[in-house]
C-alpha cells in the first residue's frame, strides 16, 4: 500500500487506474467561487515558480556535465588499480567475512541534496549509526570507484549496507554506511567538507597521476569554477521558486476546506483498516 503526493515535481501516473491505483481528488476541497478573484495572481505565481525550477534544473544538469568532464579527464587504468588496491586493504582490515552468514543486503538512501538553502548533507544521521568514519577527501569526484569495491566486498562478507548515491549523479556512490560495524565511508570536498573528526582520512587525489594532474590543472580549475557558479545559480533559483511557492500556498490557504480534507483522510484510513 502506498499513498503518493502527485504534484508538478513528483508526477506519477497510475499503470492500472481503478483496479490497482486510484486518484484521490483533493480539488473538491477548494472554494472555487471564493478563488475566482485570484485567477490572475495564481496563474502568475504558478508560472513563476515553475520557471525558477526549470532554470535550477538546467543549471544542475550543466554542472553535472562538467563534473563528468572532470572525472573523465582524470580517469585511467592506473587510477582504477590504485583505488581498487586501497579498497582491498580496507576490506582485509575492517570487513572480516562473517562465517556462515548469507550475502548482505543493500538499502539505498540519499544522504545529501541540493536545496533552496544550498547543498546539504545529513552528517548527523551518519554519526548516530557509525562511530568509525573514513573520510575520503575527494576534490575531483573519484570516490565512487573505491566505494563500489567496498560495497561489493561488504556484501560478500555478509554485511548489510546503506548505499548513498550522489544527488548530482544518482548512478554513482557518494557515501557508504555499514551500521553493523559502526563503520562509514564518507566522501568530502573543499566545497562540502565533513565537519566531524574522522577515524581515518584518505586523500583520493593522490591516486591521480601527478603528470596528468599537472597537465590538466588549468582545465580542472576552469571546470570547477564554472561548476561552483552553476551550483550557486541553481540554489538561487530554488530559493526563488520556494518563495513563489510559499506565495502560492498563501493564496490558496484561505480557500481550502481543511475539515473536508480531514474527512477524506479519515475515509481513506477506514478503507485501509479493512485490508
Q: Model segments located where?
A:
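A glycine- and Lys/Arg-enriched "phosphate-lid" helix/loop adjacent to the NTP-binding pocket
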Residues: 18-61, 197-244
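Short, small-residue-biased leader/transition segments that mark boundaries at the very start
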Residues: 1-3
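Divalent-cation
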Residues: 166, 175-178, 190
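Glycine-rich phosphate-binding P-loop
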Residues: 120, 128-154
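Short beta-strand-centered segment that lines the nucleotide-binding/catalytic pocket of NTP-utilizing
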Residues: 156-171
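Intrinsic-disorder/low-complexity recognition with aromatic hotspots
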Residues: 59, 63-94, 251-275
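N-terminal pre-Walker A segment at the start of P-loop NTPase domains
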Residues: 91-125
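Short, polar loop motifs at secondary-structure junctions
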Residues: 7-12, 187-192
Amino acid at each position: 500500500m502506498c499513498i503518493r503526493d502527485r504534484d508538478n515535481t513528483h508526477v506519477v501516473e497510475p499503470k492500472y487506474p481503478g483496479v490497482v491505483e486510484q486518484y484521490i481528488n483533493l480539488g473538491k476541497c477548494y472554494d472555487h467561487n471564493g478563488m475566482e478573484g485570484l485567477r490572475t495572481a495564481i496563474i502568475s505565481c504558478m508560472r513563476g515558480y515553475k520557471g525558477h525550477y526549470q532554470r535550477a534544473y538546467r543549471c544542475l544538469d550543466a554542472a553535472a556535465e562538467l563534473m563528468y568532464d572532470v572525472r573523465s579527464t582524470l580517469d585511467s587504468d592506473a587510477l582504477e588499480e590504485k583505488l581498487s588496491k586501497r579498497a582491498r586493504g580496507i576490506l582485509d582490515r575492517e570487513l572480516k567475512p562473517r562465517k556462515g552468514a548469507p550475502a548482505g543486503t543493500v538499502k539505498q538512501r540519499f544522504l545529501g541534496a541540493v536545496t533552496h538553502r544550498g547543498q546539504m548533507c545529513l552528517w548527523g544521521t551518519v554519526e548516530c549509526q557509525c562511530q568509525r568514519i573514513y573520510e575520503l577527501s575527494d576534490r575531483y569526484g573519484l570516490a565512487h570507484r573505491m566505494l563500489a569495491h567496498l560495497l561489493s566486498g561488504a556484501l560478500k562478507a555478509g554485511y548489510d549496507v546503506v548505499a548513498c548515491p550522489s544527488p548530482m549523479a544518482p548512478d554513482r556512490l557518494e557515501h557508504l554506511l555499514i551500521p553493523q560495524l559502526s563503520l562509514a565511508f564518507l566522501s568530502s570536498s573543499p566545497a562540502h567538507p565533513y565537519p566531524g573528526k574522522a577515524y581515518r582520512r584518505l586523500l583520493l587525489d593522490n591516486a591521480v597521476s601527478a603528470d596528468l594532474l599537472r597537465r590538466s590543472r588549468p582545465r580542472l580549475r576552469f571546470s570547477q569554477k564554472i561548476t561552483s557558479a552553476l551550483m550557486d545559480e541553481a540554489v538561487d533559483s530554488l530559493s526563488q521558486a520556494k518563495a513563489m511557492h510559499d506565495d502560492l500556498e498563501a493564496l490558496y490557504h484561505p480557500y481550502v476546506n481543511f475539515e473536508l480534507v480531514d474527512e477524506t483522510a479519515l475515509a481513506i484510513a477506514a478503507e485501509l483498516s479493512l485490508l
